[in-house]
Regions:
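Extended basic (Lys/Arg/His-rich) segments that typically form rRNA-contacting surfaces
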Residues: 2-224
Length: 224
């Protein structure tokens, strides 16, 4: 199978989305007067900074930039990339895999219209960091006896066997850094798109703290 056919097959499920900044949570009311908890996401100007194709890059995608940046905060390579295409400087660059790169050109703006007629979305962001945590909080382990004589209130217990295999099995759930990792929440209801104010309202919570960037794309899987 050629690279082009492989990429076109993969590209069938690829879709364009938007990048926004998590503002916080609030609630709105529907026609029946029921309160709906929503997360408000603010979308800044998003511009196509590069178009990639199977012929030149091995896959089809568009690179977009958002959040204006000062020159002193960018590397020489990044500054050269923007200058080459006569673009403003952007702090955040991200790719979206698409199967129709010929429909885009450098400098195009990504509008909220990409979410028109969309009911469910997948939201990806970096979860809130919790620091170093033990197994009870990190992995929901059961605790030991809490009596006065107990010596293993919240200890993890055995982490392996003895002489055989003489090592700790890779992937063993142990204490360590919790959070601050890429998380995707799928099939969230898209409650409202306020194009006039560049706001998106999504039902429920999304990953990350207030002010952190998240990616919103139409749900690609079947949903009920």
């Amino acid at each position: 199978m050629s690279a082009s056919s492989r990429m076109s097959r993969k590209g069938k499920n690829m879709t364009l989305g938007v990048i926004g900044k998590k503002v916080g949570m609030t609630q709105i009311f529907d026609e029946q007067g029921l309160a709906i908890p929503v997360t408000v996401i603010k979308v800044d100007e998003t511009v196509v900074t590069q178009v990639k194709t199977v012929e030149t890059d091995g896959y089809n995608a568009i690179q977009v930039g958002t959040i204006a940046a000062k020159e002193k905060h960018l590397t020489k390579a990044e500054l050269g990339h923007f200058k080459k295409n006569s673009l403003n400087n952007y702090r955040h660059l991200q790719e979206f895999r698409v199967d129709n790169p010929q429909d885009y050109k450098v400098g195009d703006k990504i509008e909220l219209s990409v979410l028109d007629n969309v009911e469910k979305v997948d939201v990806t962001g970096k979860s809130i960091g919790k620091g170093f945590q033990g197994t009870v909080k990190r992995w929901n382990f059961g605790r030991g006896p809490m009596g006065h004589g107990s010596k293993n209130h919240r200890e993890p217990g055995s982490i392996g066997a003895g002489t055989t295999p003489s090592r700790v099995i890779k992937g063993k759930r142990m204490a360590g850094n919790m959070g601050n990792e890429r998380v995707t929440i799928s099939k969230l209801k898209l409650v409202r798109v306020d194009a006039a104010n560049n706001l998106i309202l999504v039902k429920g919570s999304v990953p990350g703290c207030e002010g952190r960037l998240v990616t919103i794309v139409p749900t690609r899987t079947k949903w009920n």
